[in-house]
């Protein structure tokens, strides 16, 4: 008898709880999967995404080194991450913040589009990062920077400096489009190399993935190529025509490589041995 009473009480409790719970959670308001909240495309985003080139960067003038929205759709100069590479943070502190302030000042004072173009021309560090678009108002089309250097380029001069302080200081005076600054720890990479101007030399980005980039070069003589990609030695491997090739750091933060004369394929691929072995 006690068993039946216990079962009866349990059934009554279950029915009572079920009827009460259904008032608050039923088929009409139960959602099996929470909808994903994404950043809504702005006018600026839509205009930029019409550009189908493989890789370029976007600068949002609204707090670019902390905001996250630009990185959702584009390769952002800020590239938000809570733990930035120290070297990149130092580039921000020593160069990019000042150039950003100059651009913002130009927007505040410019009377013509030519005034703004002059400001972009005076931002070599932003240009070597291939900053093609400037978002000044998300609901307006962005401005295109015609002075961005592109994905990669050849330089006419190499300047070897004594240390890291001299390397970043040199960015205040050189034109990175024509001169590469190299820390003396990489001096052997350019030992014996004599830059020769080759007006017909070309370097193009053929394929882009975050962990693999493929370029084609055509030159009449050996050239020094600088790539608008962050130099990070651990895990990155470089090849020329499928054979291992050396690359090194230039201009404080970028990749550089000596490229032999002729037509060649250059591949950068991220292959960390610890990950592959595991």
Model segments located where?
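Extracytoplasmic/lumenal acceptor-recognition loop(s) of multi-pass membrane glycoenzymes
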Residues: 6-40, 44-128, 144-192, 233, ...
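Extended recognition/assembly regions associated with phosphoester-bond processing machinery
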Residues: 113, 131, 138-139
């Amino acid at each position: 008898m006690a068993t039946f009473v216990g079962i009866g009480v349990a059934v009554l409790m279950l029915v009572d709880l079920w009827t009460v719970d259904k008032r608050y959670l039923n088929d009409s308001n139960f959602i099996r999967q929470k909808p994903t909240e994404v950043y809504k495309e702005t006018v600026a985003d839509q205009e930029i995404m019409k550009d189908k080139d493989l890789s370029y960067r976007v600068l949002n003038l609204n707090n670019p080194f902390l905001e996250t929205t630009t990185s959702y759709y584009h390769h952002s100069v800020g590239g938000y991450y809570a733990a930035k590479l120290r070297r990149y943070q130092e580039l921000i502190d020593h160069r990019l913040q000042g150039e950003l302030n100059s651009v913002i000042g130009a927007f505040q004072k410019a009377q013509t589009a030519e005034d703004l173009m002059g400001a972009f021309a005076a931002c070599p560090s932003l240009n070597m990062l291939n900053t093609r678009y400037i978002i000044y108002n998300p609901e307006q089309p962005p401005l295109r920077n015609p002075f961005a250097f592109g994905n990669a380029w050849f330089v006419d001069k190499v300047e070897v400096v004594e240390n890291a302080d001299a390397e970043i200081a040199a960015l205040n005076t050189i034109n990175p489009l024509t001169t590469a600054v190299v820390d003396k720890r990489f001096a052997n990479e350019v030992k014996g190399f004599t830059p020769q101007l080759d007006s017909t030399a070309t370097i193009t980005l053929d394929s882009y993935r975050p962990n693999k980039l493929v370029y084609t070069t055509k030159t009449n003589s050996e050239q020094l190529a600088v790539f608008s990609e962050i130099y990070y030695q651990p895990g990155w491997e470089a090849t020329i025509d499928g054979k291992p090739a050396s690359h090194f750091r230039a201009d404080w933060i970028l990749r550089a490589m000596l490229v032999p004369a002729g037509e060649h394929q250059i591949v950068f691929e991220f292959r960390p041995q610890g990950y592959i072995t595991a």
